Protein backbone atom coordinates (compact mmCIF):
# COMPACT_ATOMS: atom_id res chain seq x y z
CA UNK A 1 0.00 0.00 0.00
CA UNK A 2 0.89 3.67 0.25
CA UNK A 3 1.11 3.91 4.01
CA UNK A 4 3.10 6.88 5.31
CA UNK A 5 4.94 7.08 8.60
CA UNK A 6 6.17 10.56 9.54
CA UNK A 7 7.86 12.17 12.55
CA UNK A 8 9.25 9.88 15.25
CA UNK A 9 6.93 6.86 15.59
CA UNK A 10 7.19 3.59 17.49
CA UNK A 11 5.72 0.51 15.82
CA UNK A 12 6.34 -2.92 17.28
CA UNK A 13 5.04 -6.37 18.12
CA UNK A 14 2.85 -7.65 15.31
CA UNK A 15 1.35 -4.38 14.08
CA UNK A 16 -0.31 -4.36 10.65
CA UNK A 17 -0.47 -1.11 8.70
CA UNK A 18 -1.51 -0.90 5.06
CA UNK A 19 -3.37 0.90 2.28
CA UNK A 20 -3.29 4.71 2.55
CA UNK A 21 -2.82 4.94 6.29
CA UNK A 22 -0.94 7.93 7.71
CA UNK A 23 0.85 7.44 11.03
CA UNK A 24 2.32 10.68 12.38
CA UNK A 25 4.18 10.95 15.70
CA UNK A 26 2.31 7.94 17.09
CA UNK A 27 2.98 4.74 19.04
CA UNK A 28 1.33 1.59 17.67
CA UNK A 29 1.92 -1.82 19.22
CA UNK A 30 0.81 -5.32 20.17
CA UNK A 31 -1.39 -6.54 17.33
CA UNK A 32 -3.16 -3.34 16.25
CA UNK A 33 -4.52 -3.46 12.66
CA UNK A 34 -4.78 -0.17 10.81
CA UNK A 35 -5.95 0.03 7.19
CA UNK A 36 -7.77 2.00 4.46
CA UNK A 37 -7.47 5.80 4.83
CA UNK A 38 -6.94 6.06 8.57
CA UNK A 39 -4.93 8.88 10.18
CA UNK A 40 -3.29 8.34 13.58
CA UNK A 41 -1.61 11.51 14.80
CA UNK A 42 0.12 12.27 18.13
CA UNK A 43 -1.68 9.33 19.76
CA UNK A 44 -1.14 5.73 20.86
CA UNK A 45 -2.87 2.51 19.77
CA UNK A 46 -2.16 -0.65 21.74
CA UNK A 47 -3.28 -4.27 21.59
CA UNK A 48 -5.54 -6.11 19.18
CA UNK A 49 -8.00 -3.72 17.56
CA UNK A 50 -9.12 -2.71 14.06
CA UNK A 51 -9.10 0.89 12.86
CA UNK A 52 -10.20 1.31 9.25
CA UNK A 53 -12.31 3.28 6.77
CA UNK A 54 -11.67 7.03 7.07
CA UNK A 55 -11.31 7.03 10.86
CA UNK A 56 -9.03 9.54 12.58
CA UNK A 57 -7.35 9.28 15.97
CA UNK A 58 -5.79 12.61 16.93
CA UNK A 59 -4.34 14.85 19.65
CA UNK A 60 -3.00 12.66 22.44
CA UNK A 61 -5.76 10.08 22.17
CA UNK A 62 -5.08 6.69 23.70
CA UNK A 63 -6.62 3.52 22.27
CA UNK A 64 -6.13 0.48 24.52
CA UNK A 65 -7.91 -2.66 23.34
CA UNK A 66 -8.58 -5.30 25.98
CA UNK A 67 -10.74 -8.36 25.34
CA UNK A 68 -12.17 -10.98 27.62
CA UNK A 69 -13.70 -8.82 30.35
CA UNK A 70 -17.26 -9.28 29.04
CA UNK A 71 -19.52 -12.05 27.77
CA UNK A 72 -18.38 -11.29 24.23
CA UNK A 73 -14.81 -12.47 24.68
CA UNK A 74 -13.90 -12.31 21.01
CA UNK A 75 -15.24 -8.84 20.23
CA UNK A 76 -12.40 -6.46 19.44
CA UNK A 77 -12.28 -2.69 19.72
CA UNK A 78 -13.11 -1.08 16.37
CA UNK A 79 -13.03 2.47 15.04
CA UNK A 80 -14.19 2.85 11.44
CA UNK A 81 -16.23 4.75 8.82
CA UNK A 82 -15.60 8.46 9.44
CA UNK A 83 -15.37 8.35 13.24
CA UNK A 84 -13.01 10.96 14.70
CA UNK A 85 -11.38 10.71 18.13
CA UNK A 86 -9.69 13.73 19.75
CA UNK A 87 -8.04 14.04 23.19
CA UNK A 88 -9.81 10.84 24.34
CA UNK A 89 -9.19 7.45 25.92
CA UNK A 90 -10.94 4.52 24.21
CA UNK A 91 -10.56 1.23 26.07
CA UNK A 92 -11.64 -2.46 26.07
CA UNK A 93 -14.12 -3.42 23.29
CA UNK A 94 -15.63 -0.07 22.32
CA UNK A 95 -17.16 0.41 18.84
CA UNK A 96 -16.99 3.87 17.22
CA UNK A 97 -18.33 4.30 13.68
CA UNK A 98 -20.51 6.28 11.30
CA UNK A 99 -19.80 10.00 11.54
CA UNK A 100 -19.30 9.99 15.30
CA UNK A 101 -17.15 12.81 16.68
CA UNK A 102 -15.56 12.27 20.08
CA UNK A 103 -13.56 14.93 21.94
CA UNK A 104 -12.27 14.81 25.55
CA UNK A 105 -14.07 11.57 26.41
CA UNK A 106 -13.34 8.36 28.26
CA UNK A 107 -15.20 5.50 26.56
CA UNK A 108 -14.78 1.94 27.79
CA UNK A 109 -16.18 -1.61 28.01
CA UNK A 110 -18.64 -2.33 25.14
CA UNK A 111 -19.99 1.18 24.70
CA UNK A 112 -20.89 2.31 21.18
CA UNK A 113 -21.02 5.75 19.57
CA UNK A 114 -22.23 5.95 15.98
CA UNK A 115 -24.32 7.74 13.32
CA UNK A 116 -23.84 11.51 13.72
CA UNK A 117 -23.43 11.44 17.49
CA UNK A 118 -21.34 14.18 19.09
CA UNK A 119 -19.48 13.55 22.35
CA UNK A 120 -17.90 16.75 23.56
CA UNK A 121 -15.95 17.08 26.76
CA UNK A 122 -13.47 19.86 27.45
CA UNK A 123 -10.09 20.26 29.12
CA UNK A 124 -11.74 20.44 32.57
CA UNK A 125 -14.31 17.64 32.25
CA UNK A 126 -14.42 14.48 30.14
CA UNK A 127 -17.61 12.76 29.06
CA UNK A 128 -17.65 9.19 30.46
CA UNK A 129 -19.43 6.40 28.55
CA UNK A 130 -19.12 2.81 29.72
CA UNK A 131 -20.71 -0.64 30.06
CA UNK A 132 -23.12 -1.16 27.11
CA UNK A 133 -24.24 2.46 26.76
CA UNK A 134 -24.96 3.77 23.26
CA UNK A 135 -25.10 7.24 21.72
CA UNK A 136 -26.42 7.51 18.16
CA UNK A 137 -28.64 9.39 15.73
CA UNK A 138 -27.87 13.11 15.99
CA UNK A 139 -27.60 12.96 19.78
CA UNK A 140 -25.18 15.21 21.66
CA UNK A 141 -23.55 14.57 25.03
CA UNK A 142 -21.67 17.65 26.25
CA UNK A 143 -19.69 18.30 29.42
CA UNK A 144 -19.93 21.62 31.25
CA UNK A 145 -17.03 23.68 32.54
CA UNK A 146 -18.03 23.88 36.21
CA UNK A 147 -16.86 21.27 38.71
CA UNK A 148 -18.41 17.79 38.24
CA UNK A 149 -20.21 18.80 35.02
CA UNK A 150 -19.38 15.34 33.68
CA UNK A 151 -22.09 13.47 31.76
CA UNK A 152 -21.92 9.76 32.63
CA UNK A 153 -23.67 7.04 30.63
CA UNK A 154 -23.65 3.61 32.24
CA UNK A 155 -25.16 0.13 31.90
CA UNK A 156 -27.65 -0.04 29.00
CA UNK A 157 -28.47 3.67 28.81
CA UNK A 158 -29.04 5.15 25.36
CA UNK A 159 -29.13 8.67 23.97
CA UNK A 160 -30.58 8.88 20.48
CA UNK A 161 -32.34 10.93 17.78
CA UNK A 162 -31.80 14.66 18.48
CA UNK A 163 -31.50 14.44 22.26
CA UNK A 164 -29.08 16.60 24.25
CA UNK A 165 -27.42 15.62 27.54
CA UNK A 166 -25.41 18.42 29.12
CA UNK A 167 -23.47 18.82 32.36
CA UNK A 168 -23.68 16.74 35.53
CA UNK A 169 -26.07 13.99 34.38
CA UNK A 170 -25.83 10.28 35.21
CA UNK A 171 -27.87 7.79 33.16
CA UNK A 172 -28.08 4.26 34.53
CA UNK A 173 -30.22 1.14 34.00
CA UNK A 174 -32.65 1.04 31.06
CA UNK A 175 -32.67 4.78 30.38
CA UNK A 176 -33.51 6.09 26.91
CA UNK A 177 -33.39 9.78 26.04
CA UNK A 178 -34.57 10.51 22.52
CA UNK A 179 -36.70 12.82 20.38
CA UNK A 180 -35.62 16.43 20.86
CA UNK A 181 -35.43 16.05 24.63
CA UNK A 182 -32.94 18.14 26.61
CA UNK A 183 -31.47 17.02 29.92
CA UNK A 184 -29.28 19.62 31.62
CA UNK A 185 -27.73 18.90 35.01
CA UNK A 186 -27.51 19.02 37.70
CA UNK A 187 -26.88 16.88 39.34
CA UNK A 188 -29.41 14.73 37.47
CA UNK A 189 -29.75 10.98 37.99
CA UNK A 190 -31.98 8.88 35.70
CA UNK A 191 -32.28 5.23 36.70
CA UNK A 192 -34.42 2.11 36.21
CA UNK A 193 -36.70 2.29 33.17
CA UNK A 194 -36.81 6.00 32.39
CA UNK A 195 -37.92 7.22 28.95
CA UNK A 196 -37.57 10.88 28.01
CA UNK A 197 -38.61 11.93 24.52
CA UNK A 198 -40.60 14.46 22.50
CA UNK A 199 -39.62 18.05 23.36
CA UNK A 200 -39.26 17.27 27.06
CA UNK A 201 -36.92 19.42 29.13
CA UNK A 202 -35.27 18.27 32.38
CA UNK A 203 -33.15 20.81 34.22
CA UNK A 204 -31.62 21.31 37.67
CA UNK A 205 -31.10 18.98 40.61
CA UNK A 206 -33.35 16.02 39.84
CA UNK A 207 -33.70 12.28 40.55
CA UNK A 208 -36.02 10.32 38.23
CA UNK A 209 -36.35 6.58 38.80
CA UNK A 210 -38.45 3.43 38.46
CA UNK A 211 -40.56 3.48 35.34
CA UNK A 212 -41.10 7.14 34.50
CA UNK A 213 -42.04 8.32 31.02
CA UNK A 214 -41.72 11.99 30.12
CA UNK A 215 -42.76 13.19 26.67
CA UNK A 216 -44.62 15.86 24.71
CA UNK A 217 -43.59 19.34 25.82
CA UNK A 218 -43.37 18.38 29.48
CA UNK A 219 -40.80 20.14 31.65
CA UNK A 220 -39.27 19.13 34.97
CA UNK A 221 -37.26 22.06 36.29
CA UNK A 222 -35.68 22.42 39.72
CA UNK A 223 -34.92 26.05 40.55
CA UNK A 224 -32.20 27.32 42.90
CA UNK A 225 -31.53 24.89 45.74
CA UNK A 226 -34.64 22.78 45.18
CA UNK A 227 -34.35 19.06 44.48
CA UNK A 228 -37.07 17.18 42.59
CA UNK A 229 -37.58 13.44 43.07
CA UNK A 230 -39.90 11.59 40.66
CA UNK A 231 -40.47 7.91 41.31
CA UNK A 232 -42.71 5.85 39.03
CA UNK A 233 -44.70 4.35 37.67
CA UNK A 234 -45.59 7.78 36.22
CA UNK A 235 -46.37 9.25 32.83
CA UNK A 236 -45.75 12.97 32.39
CA UNK A 237 -46.68 14.48 29.04
CA UNK A 238 -48.48 17.21 27.14
CA UNK A 239 -47.68 20.61 28.62
CA UNK A 240 -47.10 19.28 32.16
CA UNK A 241 -44.65 21.42 34.11
CA UNK A 242 -43.18 20.16 37.37
CA UNK A 243 -41.11 22.48 39.55
CA UNK A 244 -41.16 20.60 42.86
CA UNK A 245 -41.43 17.01 44.10
CA UNK A 246 -45.09 15.95 43.71
CA UNK A 247 -46.98 14.90 46.83
CA UNK A 248 -47.46 11.14 47.01
CA UNK A 249 -50.34 10.11 44.76
CA UNK A 250 -50.81 13.54 43.18
CA UNK A 251 -49.46 12.62 39.75
Language model features with spans:
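Extracellular/surface-exposed low-complexity segments
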Residues: 250-251
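Residues at the loop-to-beta-strand transition
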Residues: 3, 9, 15, 21, ...
Amino acid sequence: GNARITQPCTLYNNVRIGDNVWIDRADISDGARISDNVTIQSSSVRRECAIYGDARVLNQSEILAIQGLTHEHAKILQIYDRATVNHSRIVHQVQLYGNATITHAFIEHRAEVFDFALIEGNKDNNVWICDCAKVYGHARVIAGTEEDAIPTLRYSSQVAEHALIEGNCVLKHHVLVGGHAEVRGGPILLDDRVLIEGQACIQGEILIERQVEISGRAAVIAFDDNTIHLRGPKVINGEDRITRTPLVGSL
